Amino acid sequence: MRLATDQLGRPPQRVAVLSVHTSPLAQPGTGDAGGMNVYVLQSALHMARRGVEVEIFTRATTSADPPVVRVAPGVLVRNVVAGPFEGLDKYDLPTQLCAFTAGVLRAEATHEPGYYDIVHSHYWLSGQVGWLARDRWAVPLVHTAHTLAAVKNAALAEGDSPEPPLRAVGEQQVVDEADRLIVNTELEAEQLVSLHNADPSRIDVVHPGVDLDTFTPGDQAAARAALGLDPRETVVAFVGRIQPLKAPDILLRAAAKLPDVRVLVAGGPSGSGLAAPDNLVALADELGISERVTFLPPQSREDLVRVYRAADLVAVPSYSESFGLVAVEAQACGTPVVAAAVGGLPVAVRDGVTGALVDGHDVGDWAHTIDSLLSRGPATMRRAAVEHAATFSWAHTVDDLLASYGRAISDYRDRHPHADETLSRRTARRFSRRRGVRA
């Protein structure tokens, strides 16, 4: 359940956020960029508006990445050089964690000792770095997994690659070491307990948010005109990374059974989908529906609004989804959602009220559910969709994040009453080294 605001201990003044494998500045829908990127950036921006300074550490991926990007007052992104810019994918990054950690520690050394109040790591790779930073800086570590290897491997799409064993080992270490664990839903909390023996008292449920100022209902005809779509067509959209996990092929196969439906796909290949980036286009040809499928590249937030508004339905057929930010964004635009009944999607979508949930990935079931929603008239769900999405504001998310941070700081001080003394000794050593004398 959500944290009450009266559970908030001393709020942090400065937060170090770790996002090793993907930059919050990357375009969602490309490479490894997705909902996590949105979460990291938007939570930082909204915390900064409350006077909390946030520094986000991520791995530089091109030589053109500046060392520091000031995104907004109170929000910095530090691009840490760790390994070659080209030729590394997410599964190679464990070999670069030492280099990344060194870059983080060097950046921290430019500040006065005790600069950060807390470390928040996102994804298990960042958790490995956060574990060391926590011990070096004598501050608590809060960790958000976003996805778990065991959960993904239990629901693999056909032809998808399983997560390697080393990831499960790394995740277990971070779960054991983190001072608090933040999850998107109650189900994810249960999975941490059952799969990783996490202490339930250290877990906080914090739902991701949606930008309710950007994602709003609007004129469908205007949105379709901007995208070159026929205003008379029935449109079902898919938004996200093109990879087996996200299952866009399920939507195409279902659409092949629905001759009056146009499919709109917005996103780029990612993960194992990079091995055959044109597979989805080839599938549309094979199914004989290529004339009814429109492919768009990954969209900016402003352009994404048009996609949601243009659609009669948005489909989220993922095999695994810790929350499903696309589903909430679509509903905020007044568009009902048909989604797989997996992970956090039953929280993001109210079955029968703001859309529909489908058990499993049988193409016939998906076609039937889409047809039923379209026959019922998606417009009847629009108001409920907007009202439901309004409960997922970033303001609510940051309320709960800061409450979790406050509790982490309070608990850490209780468990480590001499943390300030430890920090003072390290401070003395640091200044002594700078002066060239022994402490």
UniProtKB/Swiss-Prot annotation:
GO terms for molecular function: acetylglucosaminyltransferase activity; D-inositol-3-phosphate glycosyltransferase activity; magnesium ion binding. It holds the Pfam family Glyco_trans_4_4. Its EC number is 2.4.1.250. 1D-myo-inositol 3-phosphate binds at H21, D32, A33, G34, G35, M36, N37, K90, Y123, T147, R167. The keyword Transferase applies. UDP-N-acetyl-alpha-D-glucosamine binds at Q27, P28, G35, R241, K246, Q299, E321, E329. Keywords: Glycosyltransferase, Magnesium, Metal-binding, Transferase. It catalyses: 1D-myo-inositol 3-phosphate + UDP-N-acetyl-alpha-D-glucosamine = 1D-myo-inositol 2-acetamido-2-deoxy-alpha-D-glucopyranoside 3-phosphate + UDP + H(+). GO terms for biological process: mycothiol biosynthetic process. Mg(2+) binds at Y308, R309, A311, T335. Belongs to the glycosyltransferase group 1 family. MshA subfamily. Catalyzes the transfer of a N-acetyl-glucosamine moiety to 1D-myo-inositol 3-phosphate to produce 1D-myo-inositol 2-acetamido-2-deoxy-glucopyranoside 3-phosphate in the mycothiol biosynthesis pathway. Homodimer. This is D-inositol 3-phosphate glycosyltransferase. The lineage of its organism: Bacteria, Bacillati, Actinomycetota, Actinomycetes, Mycobacteriales. The gene is mshA.
